[in-house]
């Protein structure tokens, strides 16, 4: 009786469970081969089409693998394209436990451009801006793979600091794009953007820390702290590349500033002042707008940035000791 009722309402839980288990078993097998046979690909696609209870596709196994992660890992483009519209965004963003990668990264390693293009708009900011243990971004991987359309999509979604980010070895996205001359279009796009952003950053640093007229106009330490915090917390750049642009900004013949001394100045400034300021920030609730430069008038985001910097970074020393310096 219950079986007939399920069929009447279009519920296929029992048969779907069996089909789903068959699908998982086949996908796991295909992740262990270099290239799947066409017959196996077709079987996977057939099983996906047969499963009516799409909630099953949102499940993950004990290793955090979803059907989409397994399909992407196996390089099954058509299977991935069938799965994506059947899954929730939350399931699409799931990360497996072994390598800590979502389906998007698996698809990128397998050169599944069309799958990546479908996945990127559904990915969370955290996954888009993820950095691995080697300091590499997804944009770096896309550049290395010569995925021009995918690279441009990342550029449109990423903040500037992620685009000019340097990995643990000091390599930039442009460095990754330049590893294969066949990817000339991707390389050119990224190099031009990197140059533009580094020049902008150099100008920003120069205006924040060198220009005497800014001090005369009343730009005080609180704003300087916010700018410096944003620089150090969010931006990890190749210091050698940045130095050349800083040198262009520093065109005062009487100035003794060097790129290295400028960066050191910012470093020392934050270490000396930021911890004490953060304690004040935590009890301030800015509730009005004014042209005053008082700390209580800083945007809430700026205050959160300062607090977050202290709580997460602490400059490698104990927080109490930092506050005493």
From Swiss-Prot:
Domain of life, per lineage: Bacteria
The entry's protein name is Putative ankyrin repeat protein RF_0011
What InterPro entries does UniProt report for this protein, alphabetically? Answer: Ankyrin_rpt-contain_sf (IPR036770)
Q: What organism, scientifically named, is this protein from? A: Rickettsia felis (strain ATCC VR-1525 / URRWXCal2) (Rickettsia azadi)
The stretches annotated as ANK repeats are 63-94, 99-130, 134-164
Give the SUPFAM superfamilies listed for this entry.
Ankyrin repeat (SSF48403)
Q: What keywords are annotated for this sequence in UniProt?
A: ANK repeat, Repeat
């Amino acid at each position: 009786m219950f079986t007939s009722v399920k069929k009447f309402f279009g519920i296929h839980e029992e048969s779907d469970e069996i089909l789903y288990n068959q699908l998982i078993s086949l996908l796991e097998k295909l992740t262990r081969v270099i290239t799947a046979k066409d017959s196996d690909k077709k079987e996977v696609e057939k099983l996906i089409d047969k499963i009516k209870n799409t909630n099953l596709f949102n499940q993950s196994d004990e290793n955090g693998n979803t059907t989409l992660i397994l399909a992407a890992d196996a390089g099954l483009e058509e299977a991935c394209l069938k799965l994506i519209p059947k899954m929730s965004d939350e399931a699409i963003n799931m990360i497996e436990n072994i390598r800590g990668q979502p389906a998007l990264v698996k698809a990128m390693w397998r050169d599944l451009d069309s799958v990546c293009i479908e996945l990127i708009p559904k990915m969370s900011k955290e996954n888009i801006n993820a950095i691995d243990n080697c300091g590499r971004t997804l944009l770096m991987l896309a550049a290395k793979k010569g995925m021009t359309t995918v690279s441009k999509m990342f550029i449109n979604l990423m903040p500037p600091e992620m685009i000019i980010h340097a990995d643990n070895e000091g390599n930039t996205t442009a460095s990754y794009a330049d590893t294969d001359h066949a990817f000339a279009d991707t390389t050119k796009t990224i190099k031009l953007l990197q140059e533009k952003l580094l020049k902008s950053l150099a100008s920003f640093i120069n205006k924040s820390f060198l220009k005497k007229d800014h001090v005369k106009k009343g730009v005080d330490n609180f704003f300087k702290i916010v700018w410096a915090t944003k620089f150090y917390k969010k931006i990890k750049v190749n210091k050698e590349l940045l130095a050349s642009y800083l040198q262009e900004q520093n065109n005062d013949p009487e100035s003794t500033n060097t790129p290295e001394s400028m960066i050191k100045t910012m470093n020392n400034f934050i270490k000396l002042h930021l911890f004490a300021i953060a304690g004040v920030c935590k009890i301030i609730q800015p509730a009005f707008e004014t042209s005053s430069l008082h700390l209580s008038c800083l945007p809430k985001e700026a205050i959160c940035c300062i607090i977050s910097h202290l709580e997460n970074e602490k400059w490698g020393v104990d927080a109490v000791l930092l506050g005493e310096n």
